Amino acid sequence: MEANSADQKQKPNFLVEVNNIEKQLWTLIHSKTILHTDVSELYAKAGSTYEQIFKSNLQHEELQEVEFCLWKLHYKHIDEFRKGLKTNDHAKHMKAFKLFLSKAAEFYQNLISKVRGYYHRLSEESGEQKSRFLCHRFYICLGDLQRYQEQYLKAHEHPNWSTAATYYLEAAKSWPDSGNPHNQLAVLATYVSDELLALYHCVRSLAVKEPFPGASNNLLLLFEKNRSSPLQSLSTDAEFNYLNPSEKKVSVKERDLSKAKGELVAGIDLWPLVVRTTSFFFLKSSFDEFGRAFASTIRELDAAFAADDRNLEAMLESYQFMDTARKGPYKILQIVAVFIYIFHNLAEANGSDIVKEEVKLTNLALTMVFIVMGRVVERCLKTTPLDSCPLLPALLVFLDYLPFLLDKVEEEEEECRFDEKSKSAISYFFGKLVDILNQLKVKDKNCPAKTLLALWEDHELKSLAPLAPIHALLDFSSNMDLRESFDRGKELRLQRIISSAIDITTRQKKGSQKWLFFDNQRTHFYTTSGELQSNGELFHGNGEGRNRKCVTIGPVEIIPLENERSVPVEEEEVILLKPLVRCQSAPIYSSGIAAKPLSSDCTTSGNQTTTSNDSLRRTLSLIGSESFSFTQGLKDTDPQHLHLEEGTVSGRPPSLSAWVVDKNKEKGRLGLSKPNGLGPIDETGPVSAFDSLSINSSTEHPASSYSPPTPSAPLLPEDASWFHNDASTNKAESFYDQTRYMELPGIMKPYTNPPFVGISSSEWLRRYRESRNLGPAYSYQAQGTNNLRNFMAHGSSKFSLLARYGTPNDSSQNSTFHPQLYMEDHESRGEKLGNVQQSTTNPYGFSDDPGPFLRFLREKEWLNENGQRLRGPPPAYMNN
């Protein structure tokens, strides 16, 4: 307490004393110029007084004020010497200026030692803070003094900025929260014409707790200078396919990578383009101009990444003109830091009048960043061994920040979220990321304590404000050797990458879209197309067939591989049904089906069992009813041949019947007439959920109730294909009536043709008997068997149940493929069915026929009335 009281008493005295000394000094300079001998004496006296003030245990704010006054004393001397250099007495002023800079540098170096010693003896935390703050300010002054010496005293020599850069970097290390050292480094970067390095340090001087006041203007000046400079590598006709980011249209130019590191053509062309592309997020510009700049940037980036590992590492050096001892892949790390600041700056922009513009800029930034980082991941995969890739530190930093970025974007309103281009870019990045993650070994999904050690890249970006939540979890105090080189801690870096990726997979925020998934059992990463799953392909990361593609139609996944079960997506995805799994044979793609598009409307109810004949008939009748097709022809079971045209897949369960036809019977379109028929194929999987699906996209219809008829009437299959399900329209269904599908594209029905609502099969039979006497049909027998249990599945196709009066059915004239047009569209369904016998000829020229339904009733009536020999268990196609 007594020491503090003494310091408080001495403080006013020292301040008054130094104030008086400075008054005498400026009076002497103005009267006798700065070259007078008394000037140096008064300067030394003022310096010693300031030393005493720093030892008086001032408050932090007071130390800032005193330190500023001390630097102002030196800066006034520097300003006077610069004025003298313009006079006739140039040589004397130059000599005196050089002497003053040397004395001033020596003064600050001694002051650092004295301040550290004084505050170290205090043994207080506040004393340590004051010491670090003052030393950081003194290092900045030392850097400025050295910079002036190189700038003014070595005008005819090649300046060496390494000493000044070393002081600035030491200042940043002493007090990371200050933006002043980085602003000074940005100034040095402009001296060596390194625009990317200047951009990086301008960003660092802004994205800290204590931003440098003039850094914002310096950043804008840097962008304006870049805009005004012509760039030879900027192509006015360059284009980029945002919906296919992995596409590389331009060929890599031949580059002489044997040149000096600082003269690499790829680097000279690339880095100014990065600055030009970044400027669009800070200066008002045309989006068309951005497209050309970005396309040119990606072209040069591809060219740079085409270099081998040695030349790539040399290309990524950043401080070769400022500090030759500072080595590492700084360029790519600086680009990632700039990307992070872009999102940080956009998030802080407020104002409803610019919301739309900010949304566009955000999506544009997402597109740019994820495409560039996708290229980074691609290049990492080409490095052997993988842990030696110089791009991995930048990838780790980006993965650490990625959960915060995705959460920040998804916090916006619905219209502010990802657009088509940004979704494509994000999917591209994660698709490449999965490849590199699955090459690494996941030792422990819970990040061990040793992996929380700060690595080289963490020390480099320490105090970058957007990364503060991440740095708070890292240990910067131990294992300081890790900060020396990016080559150290390779194993820790790989484990950190895996840990960051797992953190991305565990994002549980409500409404957030998941881009990456992790299988805990197999320690395997996989990705899915998320909200776009109904328009394309899914990648599965676990199971026997991981990383294989499967076709997705609506909420059900159909995997065209035998005995392979799919992995349902995580709970975040909206899955109506678990995937149905093939148990016997893979789907067959006949030449007949491949010749024409396959409609997505080929659907059957999940609550019924259908015969393969019905499945094939239903499939063939709906060919061409919707727009999407299997464009690859479905020639084999290779999943790579399954391609769906984008944006046309209905969000409905597919027709499984179309996939289960027998291989041997599906060689041709007219295989229904061949012996032994098409046997049923067992399907396993939950099917009860099909009941909840709606019949029409715009109108909900209740499920058709069905009661078994009396024994005297024939039993009807639940999927009777002779009625149209739309009870509101009451239109007759003709397999070749294309207008129905053209008017209602994309409508999916759980029953292809459910029974007419409101009338039972018994009532139909009664009405039919009253209107027409049924004569017994000609007898027939199933070939080779007396058991009709599986007649429809395995019975004779020569004597079809659909053939009129039991006559053999010619394969070329199968009634399934030549349906009747029963009546006009304006008639109601009841009128059509009641007057069916009045039909004479249809527009297709076919003869009068009571139709497949009435023939079916006649034949089944005959079966019920004739002997017990033919009676057996219900046929397989009846769902009894």
UniProtKB/Swiss-Prot annotation:
Q: Which Pfam families match?
A: EST1 (PF10374), EST1_DNA_bind (PF10373)
Q: Where is the composition biased (Polar residues)?
A: 691-701
Q: Supply the InterPro entries for this chain.
A: DNA/RNA-bd_Est1-type, Est1-like_N, Est1/Ebs1-like, TPR-like_helical_dom_sf
The annotated phenotype of a deletion mutant is: No visible phenotype under normal growth conditions.
**Where does the record place the region Disordered?**
669-711
- What does the UniProt keyword field contain? Repeat, TPR repeat
What Gene3D superfamilies does the record point to?
A: Tetratricopeptide repeat domain (1.25.40.10)
Matches recorded under SUPFAM superfamilies: TPR-like
What function does the entry list? May play a role in growth and development.
What is the protein named?
Answer: Nonsense-mediated mRNA decay factor SMG7-like
From which source organism is this entry? Arabidopsis thaliana
